[in-house]
Amino acid sequence: MRTQSLYNTHFSHTSFAVSNAAESTNDGKENGLISELVYNEHQPAVVQLLLPLLQQLGMQSRWLLWLTPQQKLSKLWLQQSGLPVGKVVQLSQINSLDTVEAMEKALLTGNYSVVLGWLPDLTEEDRLKLRRAAELGNAYGFIMRPQRDINPVHGHCSTLKIHSSLYH
């Protein structure tokens, strides 16, 4: 697992992102996507939902990027979960505005099969930017949102949890 600072990232805008996306989409449709997962401390299902996908994406030659605001990923948890520790990159201790920008840049590069970002509520413009970046980079982007950011006025939301034991 590699931990990177925001100021020492290896985001490079190369032709790889566009050419790789074009080569992998024979039907002319983009394959990238953005999805949001809302979780809380009492529902551990997100791990069971995400792990098989993350394990499969870990078999690609590309990296798995975790943009985490405060936590540091546990190397032991990564190993026990069957994730390729050598392909996991983590950026931590960045504010949410920088996280949106970092996620967009990472998705665009095509160097990451998946980018997980812990983000606050996004504007439609931010969502569109991330969706386009995921499509161009042929990558999956998961917007992770703690339940505390849910507005109760909008009714009940299905929620998922990432256990704090995933971090150390």
Curated annotation (Swiss-Prot):
Gene3D superfamilies: P-loop containing nucleotide triphosphate hydrolases. Induction: By DNA damage, as part of the SOS response. SUPFAM superfamilies: P-loop containing nucleoside triphosphate hydrolases. It holds the Pfam family SulA. Is rapidly cleaved and degraded by the Lon protease once DNA damage is repaired. The record marks 168 as: Essential for degradation by Lon protease. Residues 106-112 are annotated as: FtsZ binding. Coiled coil: none annotated. Keywords: Cell cycle, Cell division, DNA damage, Septation, SOS response. The keyword Cell division applies. One of its GO terms (biological process) is SOS response. Residues 161-168 are annotated as: Lon protease binding. HAMAP family: SulA. Belongs to the SulA family. Component of the SOS system and an inhibitor of cell division. Accumulation of SulA causes rapid cessation of cell division and the appearance of long, non-septate filaments. In the presence of GTP, binds a polymerization-competent form of FtsZ in a 1:1 ratio, thus inhibiting FtsZ polymerization and therefore preventing it from participating in the assembly of the Z ring. This mechanism prevents the premature segregation of damaged DNA to daughter cells during cell division. Interacts with FtsZ. This is Cell division inhibitor SulA.
